[in-house]
Amino acid sequence: MADNTGTDNKGTGCSGWFLVEAIVDRKTGEEISDDEDETVEDSGLDMVDFIDDRCITHNSLEAQALLNEQEADAHYAAVQDLKRKYLGSPYVSPLGHIEQSVECDISPRLNAIQLSRKPKKVKRRLFQSREITDSGYGHTEVEVEAATQVERHGEPENGCGGGGHGRDKEGEGQVHTEVHTESEIEHHTGTTRVLELLKCKDIRATLHGKFKQCYGLSFTDLIRQFKSNKTTCEDWVVAAFGVHHSVSEAFEKLIQPLTIYRHIQWLTNEWGMLLLVLLRFKVNKNRCTVARTLATLLNIPEDHMLIEPPKIQSSVAALYWFRTSLSNASIVTGETPEWIARQTIVEHGLADSQFKLTEMVQWAYDNDYCDECDIAFEYAKRADFDSNAKAFLNSNCQAKYVKDCATMCKHYKNAEMKKMTMNQWIKHRSKKIDETGNWKPIVQFLRHQNIEFISFLSKLKLWLQGTPKKNCIAIVGPPDTGKSMFCMSLIKFLGGTVISYVNSSSHFWLQPLCNTKVALLDDATHSCWGYMDTYMRNLLDGNPMSIDRKHKSLALIKCPPLLVTSNIDITTEEKYKYLYSRVTVFKFPNPFPFDRNGNAVYELCDANWKCFFARLSASLDIQDSEDEDDGDTSQAFRCVPGTVVRTV
């Protein structure tokens, strides 16, 4: 037992025993209600004066309004403290205010201790708003010229918040300034900076200025402007402002299925994440499509982006993308666009040379381009992979080069044609046709017109050889008998030219006969036959004749084989009796047949004419000689100087 030494008056005083008397109103096992005390008798006295029906005076109204305003301000201040404590800003990086954050974390009052008075800095506020907003990381700035400092207990405190990082602590003295209205307080946080800035009148000018401030160069140095939003392009440069940092981490994977090349640069500023990206899409897109796509991926409005195609002809722009792709500030995936490689890679730079007209002429000759418009258009499309075509586009004399190229190509083609015989020319024209064809539709059509095929072959043989008095064949008959269709298909296969009497008022209407193997005069009327009977008898004979040429001297030529179509049968006209012996006439009396679908029954195409001349070459005396059976051993024409190959 414990020692009780020193204890007096056992059982008495504060250390003694005490009695507790309990009053039990219910017996064991009786249910107890969960409601309020059932024993209390409700007399209704507690509801007396529940409704304040006293007379309201003017002074009480003002007091109540003041109380409501003070309670609203207190609630608002509590909510703002919670926001600054728990919410993060999606627009502003914490690095934007690192200096001020460190000061406030070390000591909330350290920033207020000043040994000398700081000069007032005049700041020009371009964009202001009267809204009270908060983003968490942003600063709450009171719109006054100087910060109001209030001393309490001998310690000065700054009136501005520390960027949302400094918070009041319990037990410390707090300064409660007077409640300012919304018109006197502006909260310029990261969110409000973006929203206020982008609500200004000229958004594009603001975005261009911010881009130049962040990257140190103008956005227009990298792009060329498209005035229309519907113009499509394969490559696009996009600058996006106010992107959330969580989106920036996943953007590369989100954009990958849509593009084949991506050059991504991220930069953090006071607005948040700034994106600069060069994209090459799998298909051509216009500005509206690109804006909708990126607005969905980046979760920003479309007017927060600058979207333009890149400068593909600027070496400065190409060098910028090339140099930045080598740094760790860029994320580059995919094959480098050819316009960047062409202007930056050493091999491409060495391949660039001055324009050579001979290479352009050789290309036009090999591809049978003699028209200026075709030469200009087709050669310009080769600039992506042909250095000479690129030099052609960079030249200021493109029109002159195109004209000279077409002229030289025509000279080479005419010289080549005049050097060939008719047999060689038909063989040359047949090589340009890949299809085999069938010769029977041509024979069937001649039989349909009641023309003896053997007689037609004998006349055609003399016509191809240019025999005097047999140098002109006339196809006559009623309309819609297939005269023009038959002759046009033959002239097209032989690469001939077509002359028209409608130009007879000009002295030069016969000039095309100087540079052709065969010719066609379509739809000769009485006036045309009369002109031929008066002035062109020597021409129809196949004898030499002088032809007037524009800007050139007269040319003495032998008329090429000539086809004439007409609705007039000159063999029945007495006045054309001097043409009877000079013109071979074939009559087409029957209409040209068509099936019920409107297609020609007898197909007269180049492939069928190729088969026709190949099948009947022996009858037409155009068969290759024995020396030519082994193929053409002559070298292809070259107008570009070659290099001498030294043999070992």
From Swiss-Prot:
It comes from the Viruses. Residues 451-601 form the SF3 helicase domain. There is a cross-link at residue 558 (Glycyl lysine isopeptide (Lys-Gly) (interchain with G-Cter in SUMO)). Pfam families: PPV_E1_C (PF00519), PPV_E1_DBD (PF20450), PPV_E1_N (PF00524). A motif (Nuclear export signal) lies at residues 106-115. It is found in: Host nucleus. Keywords: ATP-binding, DNA replication, DNA-binding, Early protein, Helicase, Host nucleus, Hydrolase, Isomerase, Isopeptide bond, Nucleotide-binding, Phosphoprotein, Ubl conjugation. Its main location: host cell. It catalyses: Couples ATP hydrolysis with the unwinding of duplex DNA by translocating in the 3'-5' direction; ATP + H2O = ADP + phosphate + H(+). Can form hexamers. Interacts with E2 protein; this interaction increases E1 DNA binding specificity. Interacts with host DNA polymerase subunit POLA2. Interacts with host single stranded DNA-binding protein RPA1. Interacts with host TOP1; this interaction stimulates the enzymatic activity of TOP1. ATP-dependent DNA 3'-5' helicase required for initiation of viral DNA replication. It forms a complex with the viral E2 protein. The E1-E2 complex binds to the replication origin which contains binding sites for both proteins. During the initial step, a dimer of E1 interacts with a dimer of protein E2 leading to a complex that binds the viral origin of replication with high specificity. Then, a second dimer of E1 displaces the E2 dimer in an ATP-dependent manner to form the E1 tetramer. Belongs to the papillomaviridae E1 protein family. This is Replication protein E1. It comes from Pygmy chimpanzee papillomavirus type 1.
